[in-house]
Amino acid sequence: MLLDGGILSTSVLGQRVAGVDEVGRGPLAGPVIAGAVILDPECPISGVKDSKQLTAPARERLAALIQAQAVAWALGRAEAAEIDQFNILQASLLAMERAISALSVVPDLVLVDGKHCPPTVCPVRAIVKGDQQIMAIGAASIVAKVARDAEMIAFEESYPGYGFGIHKGYPTRAHLAALKALGPCSIHRRSFRPVRRFLEA
């Protein structure tokens, strides 16, 4: 389904189409998480769009609807250590691959947001700005964003003082100040330049 209300049927010619997107490429800490969603063409979900265009309450409401009504949905992740090991692009593709593999229904076609396709046994196509065009990709971005935000909020208790629940690991002024005062913790991405700078100081 297209987000403008037109149809790129979620079952193109009877095929099961999975939308895939990741969140968390830009933060200095925490995992990158990918969502994979196969929507039910008989149950369109109003309001689905790129997760960045939604408020947190709207994302949470839509994530619950997506999880309840989708044919299948799943999450995949790559940890900070894997991001440091492989680089953020390869870690993002790994998270996508894991999300696709975790689906309870095998898709006939996978549509991925962006320019790069993850390795998968299914036919896959990358669509630039797909999260703004394809409903299943928008849905994937929503479930991934809600899951990652919840995890970063939970890290507040494990790693007090960094403000992860507020900035979600992104390089805000407050986060950089906390890094300077406390140094990196175990979920920081040591290969990212701002974190590496504090490690080398």
From Swiss-Prot:
Enzyme class label: hydrolase
Cofactor note: Manganese or magnesium. Binds 1 divalent metal ion per monomer in the absence of substrate. May bind a second metal ion after substrate binding.
Keyword Manganese annotated: yes
Keyword Cell membrane annotated: no
Names of required cofactors: Mn(2+); Mg(2+)
Superkingdom to which the source organism belongs: Bacteria
A GO molecular function held by the record: manganese ion binding
One Gene Ontology term from the biological process aspect of the record: DNA replication, removal of RNA primer
RNase H type-2 domain: residues covered: 15-201
Enzyme Commission number(s): 3.1.26.4
A GO CC term assigned to this protein in UniProt: ribonuclease H2 complex
Keywords of the record: Cytoplasm, Endonuclease, Hydrolase, Manganese, Metal-binding, Nuclease
Transmembrane segments: none
Entry's localization field: Cytoplasm
Reaction it catalyzes: Endonucleolytic cleavage to 5'-phosphomonoester
Residues the record lists as binding a divalent metal cation: 21-22, 113
Function summary: Endonuclease that specifically degrades the RNA of RNA-DNA hybrids.
Family (UniProt): Belongs to the RNase HII family.
Protein name: Ribonuclease HII
Native source species: Nitrosococcus oceani (strain ATCC 19707 / BCRC 17464 / JCM 30415 / NCIMB 11848 / C-107)
